[in-house]
């Protein structure tokens, strides 16, 4: 199973990069122990279109080409999505890791949100918080929760009840 994070925009702030890379390295160390053969980060350039809806649609068109739709589970992050506790998030991830698909995609739209087309291909829409998070903070927060969930799955002491 491949686990992928697809995001509109690139991390350019060194403080975010440092924290993001910390969790990325930790995930790579343990991913094979839970059946993840590859962990990939896919960054899509933001569209320069002036119209918000057109911009989101253009970003979707680039992003969807990076997804193997028939053989993937697509989890969209959206502030209106379902909220999870850490244990519920771990259970969702564990469920999808046992599906007969080749990849799980966590998708973060651009700063203006996600197009309706992107929302339609999502198998699940989740929210990391009831609060609005900055785009880059959402990425870091997702990476931490992925690492935490994977740690729970292998009984690593990172997560404490």
What are the residue ranges of the model-derived segments?
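Conserved RecA-like P-loop NTPase ATPase core
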Residues: 5, 75, 109, 142
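Short glycine-rich anion-binding loops that position phosphate/pyrophosphate groups of nucleotides
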Residues: 11, 79-82, 110-113
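Conserved strand-to-helix beginnings and helix N-cap segments that scaffold or border functional pockets
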Residues: 17, 53, 86-90, 119, ...
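Short, acidic/small-residue loops that bind anionic groups at enzyme active sites
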Residues: 98-107, 129-135
């Amino acid at each position: 199973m491949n686990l992928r994070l697809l995001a509109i925009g690139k991390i350019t702030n060194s403080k975010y990069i440092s924290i993001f890379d910390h969790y990325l390295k930790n995930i790579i160390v343990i991913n094979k122990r839970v059946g993840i053969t590859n962990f990939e980060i896919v960054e899509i350039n933001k569209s320069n279109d002036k119209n918000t809806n057109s911009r989101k649609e253009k970003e979707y068109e680039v992003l969807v080409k990076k997804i193997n739709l028939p053989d993937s589970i697509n989890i969209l992050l959206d502030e209106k999505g379902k909220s999870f506790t850490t244990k519920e998030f771990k259970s969702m991830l564990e469920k999808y890791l046992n599906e007969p698909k080749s990849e799980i995609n966590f998708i973060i739209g651009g700063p203006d949100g996600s197009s309706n087309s992107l929302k339609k291909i999502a198998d699940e829409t989740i929210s990391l918080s009831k609060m609005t998070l900055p785009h880059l903070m959402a990425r870091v927060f997702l990476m931490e929760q992925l690492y935490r969930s994977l740690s729970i799955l292998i009984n690593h002491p990172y997560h404490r009840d």
